[in-house]
């Protein structure tokens, strides 16, 4: 390009890399931050909230059975963040209204699952979202995944997590 600069009457300008904490802001850095659970730093570099877009799949209804119905989002092709619990906001296709919620990204160790899943519980929502496309924006990492001895312990922890997520802006 530089050798054609004079011929084509344009100027090549080499951009300066964007630095964050003396590191070049790059997709590799964002992936590393996400995998370490440093969501807020990754979002700052992205200048937006990291998100996953996927279709709601029918699950085993475990969330519903313990009082927290969830949308199970298909996430097969995504670079994923650290497994854990997150405060999220969700946008439905053809809607401009965000719904706040809480998500578990992980293996559901209390239920001995082997496949990673994204499960989202939406606040103040009831309805059928099966096969609908959702964009899930991750706002805050709340805690890492944990195996509970029983469903009652899990339910108690989910209530604590919900309180944190509801306060997240």
Where are the regions a protein language model picked out?
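Charged helix-capping and loop-helix junction motifs
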Residues: 1-2, 119
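Phosphate/ribose-recognition catalytic cores of enzymes acting on nucleotide-derived substrates
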Residues: 58-169
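Glycine-rich, Lys/Arg-enriched anion-binding loops that position phosphate/diphosphate groups
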Residues: 6-104
């Amino acid at each position: 390009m530089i050798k054609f600069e004079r011929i084509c009457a344009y100027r090549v300008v080499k951009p300066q890399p964007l630095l964050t904490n003396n590191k070049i802001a790059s997709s590799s850095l964002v992936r590393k931050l996400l995998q370490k659970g440093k969501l807020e730093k990754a979002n700052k570099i992205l200048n937006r909230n990291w998100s996953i877009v996927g279709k709601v799949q029918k699950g085993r209804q475990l969330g519903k059975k313990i009082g927290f119905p969830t949308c199970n989002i298909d996430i097969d092709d995504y670079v994923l963040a650290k497994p854990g619990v997150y405060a999220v906001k969700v946008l439905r296709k053809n809607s401009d209204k965000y719904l706040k919620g809480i998500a578990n990204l992980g293996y559901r160790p209390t239920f001995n699952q082997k496949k990673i899943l994204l499960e989202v519980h939406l606040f103040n929502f009831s309805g059928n979202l099966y096969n609908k496309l959702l964009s899930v924006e991750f706002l805050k990492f709340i805690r890492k995944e944990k195996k509970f001895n029983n469903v009652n312990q899990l339910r108690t922890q989910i209530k604590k997590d919900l309180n944190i997520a509801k306060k997240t802006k």
